């Protein structure tokens, strides 16, 4: 209905233009008015936006204007022989910011996550995906073309998304982004072992003597490496995560350890915490020993917020037996011992 009414108004305007008691005239100063054009040294009326000149003026008759048809337009006063065609429909990675009508061309701009590589007189002609900043990086700005600039998150900030829009966020309080587990066992005679397998919910280290299994639930930091080293019948092993994911404080990261002797006994007992420096970080642990092959066991679990000035930590430890020192550390030069890892593991300071 609106388009019909608009066409009718344009039609009337054309009648008014052509019906005015104005005939082409010779300008006294050689110049025509803004809404006129010059033809054969005569000033003639231009057609208004939304119309075109179906017939140009002559010495006795002014310009005849006709409304633009569907899919065509003129956006200014003109004496064009036909209306201009509107741009085609926007691509899938674009949004239409202005539709085609008889007075305006269609305008397409890039959708969120894209930027323009080919601009036209009416919007963007071609868009491509913006760079996505990886975990640990955030959007810090944009190039002159509109692509994303990624910068590492600084101290006190973090990013756990792959995104072309997210900036680095302030580090959340009372949580952690790193878990380091150290397990000391005595006596251990067999230095042979196999690479740890990852199933998504558990990690395990197996030798001919024993099997260490850690089941984890609702833990956002991702366990990525593990190690096993034997020196003077003391095995030092453990698991640790990357530092690019923070624990969601609405969940409790739960670690359940089972240290099982493969050939000596089947009795089971659960250890109690020997040291409890845990604060309000969201975590929970259990440790179960199965069998009689070990006389001493130490377990240290460190939950850390490594991206703060004060390096916030919670430390949990378990101890059984009287041979191992509760403050013992992993050997500082583990690469000379039997080791399962892709790189030298970290250890407590």
Swiss-Prot record:
Pfam families in the record: CrmD_SECRET (PF07190), TNFR_c6 (PF00020)
Signal peptide positions on this chain: 1-19
Localisation per UniProt entry: Secreted
GO MF annotation list: tumor necrosis factor binding; tumor necrosis factor receptor activity
Domain of life: Viruses
Keywords for the protein's UniProt record, in alphabetical order: Disulfide bond, Glycoprotein, Receptor, Repeat, Secreted, Signal
Induction notes from the record: Expressed in the early phase of the viral replicative cycle.
InterPro entries xrefs: Poxvirus_TNF-rcpt-II_C, Poxvirus_TNF_rcpt-II, TNF_chemokine_rcpt-like, TNFR/NGFR_Cys_rich_reg, TNFRSF_N_viral
GO biological process: positive regulation of membrane protein ectodomain proteolysis; regulation of T cell proliferation; symbiont-mediated perturbation of host defense response
This protein's record includes keyword Signal: yes
Gene3D superfamilies reported in the protein's UniProt record: 2.60.240.20, Tumor Necrosis Factor Receptor, subunit A, domain 2 (2.10.50.10)
The TNFR-Cys repeat ranges on this chain: 31-65, 67-108
Glycosites: 101, 189, 248
Keyword Glycoprotein: yes
Disulfide bonds: 32-43, 44-57, 47-65, 68-83, 86-100, 90-108
Major place of residence: secreted
CDD domains associated with the record: TNFRSF_viral
One Gene Ontology CC term in the entry: extracellular region
PANTHER family on file: TUMOR NECROSIS FACTOR RECEPTOR SUPERFAMILY MEMBER 1B (PTHR47386:SF1)
Role: Inhibits host immune defense by binding to host TNF and various chemokines in the extracellular space. Binds host CC chemokines (beta chemokines) and CXC chemokines (alpha chemokines).
Family: Belongs to the orthopoxvirus OPG002 family.
Protein name, as recorded: Soluble TNF receptor II
Organism: Camelpox virus (strain CMS)
Upper taxonomic lineage: Viruses, Varidnaviria, Bamfordvirae, Nucleocytoviricota, Pokkesviricetes
């Amino acid at each position: 209905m609106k388009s019909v009414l608009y066409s009718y108004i344009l039609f009337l305007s054309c009648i008014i233009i052509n019906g005015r008691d104005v005939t082409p005239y010779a300008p006294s100063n050689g110049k025509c008015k803004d809404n006129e054009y010059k033809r054969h040294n005569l000033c003639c009326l231009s057609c208004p936006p939304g119309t075109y000149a179906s017939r140009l003026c002559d010495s006795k008759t002014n310009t005849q204007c006709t409304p633009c048809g569907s899919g065509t337009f003129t956006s200014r006063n003109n004496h064009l022989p036909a209306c201009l065609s509107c741009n085609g429909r926007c691509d899938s990675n674009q949004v239409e910011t202005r539709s085609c009508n008889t007075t305006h061309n269609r305008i397409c701009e890039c959708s969120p996550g894209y930027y323009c590589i080919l601009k036209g007189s009416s919007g963007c002609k071609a868009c491509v995906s913006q760079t996505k900043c990886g975990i640990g990086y955030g959007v810090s700005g944009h190039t002159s073309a509109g692509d994303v600039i990624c910068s590492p998150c600084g101290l006190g900030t973090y990013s756990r998304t792959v995104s072309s829009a997210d900036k680095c966020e302030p580090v959340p309080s009372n949580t952690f982004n790193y878990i380091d587990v150290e397990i000391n066992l005595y006596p251990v005679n067999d230095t042979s072992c196999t690479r740890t397998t990852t199933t998504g919910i558990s990690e395990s280290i197996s030798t001919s003597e024993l099997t260490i299994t850690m089941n984890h639930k609702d833990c956002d930091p991702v366990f990525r490496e593990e190690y096993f080293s034997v020196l003077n019948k003391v095995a030092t092993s453990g698991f640790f995560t990357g530092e690019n994911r923070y624990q969601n404080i609405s969940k409790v990261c739960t670690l359940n350890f089972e240290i099982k002797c493969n050939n000596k006994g089947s009795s089971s007992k659960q250890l109690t915490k020997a040291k409890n420096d845990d604060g309000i970080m969201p975590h929970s642990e259990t440790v179960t020993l199965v069998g009689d092959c070990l006389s001493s066991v130490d377990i240290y679990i460190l939950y850390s917020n490594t991206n703060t000035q004060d390096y916030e930590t919670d430390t949990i430890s378990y101890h059984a037996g009287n041979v191992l020192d509760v403050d013992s550390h992993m050997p500082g030069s583990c690469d000379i011992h039997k080791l399962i890892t892709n790189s030298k593991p970290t250890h407590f300071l």
